[in-house]
């Protein structure tokens, strides 16, 4: 099963921009497990992920193994392509 962990923050402009794109992809791929984490509010869950300073971060898991990370703002098409090609 594919799981996408999205780490973002309410103060992050790029994260706010990506929120609508995330929603569209969540609707398109409902069989994927989507997990939204806030960099500040969920720090105990985010810290072990070592996401760095560039957010949003998308961590893609396949069968509970991390297979890819992508970070930053991008078009919906680019994000979808990145999420599909792991």
Spans of model-derived segments:
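Structural micro-motif
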Residues: 49-59
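Local sequence-structure signature of Cys/Sec-based thiol-disulfide redox active-site neighborhoods
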Residues: 1-28
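Non-catalytic, surface beta->alpha helical segment in thiol-disulfide oxidoreductase systems
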Residues: 59-86
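Conserved coupling/switch loop of ABC ATPases
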Residues: 14, 56, 62
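Thiol-based oxidoreductase modules, predominantly thioredoxin-like and allied folds used
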Residues: 7, 30-44
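A short beta-strand-turn-helix
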Residues: 1-3, 43-44, 49-50
């Amino acid at each position: 099963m594919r799981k996408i962990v999205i780490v973002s923050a309410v103060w992050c402009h790029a994260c706010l921009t990506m929120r609508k794109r995330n929603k569209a992809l969540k609707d398109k791929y409902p069989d994927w497990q989507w997990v939204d984490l806030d960099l500040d509010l969920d720090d105990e869950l985010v810290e072990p992920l070592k996401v760095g300073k560039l957010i949003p971060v998308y961590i893609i898991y396949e069968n509970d193994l991390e297979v890819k990370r992508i970070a930053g703002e991008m078009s919906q098409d680019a994000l979808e392509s990145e999420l599909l090609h792991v």
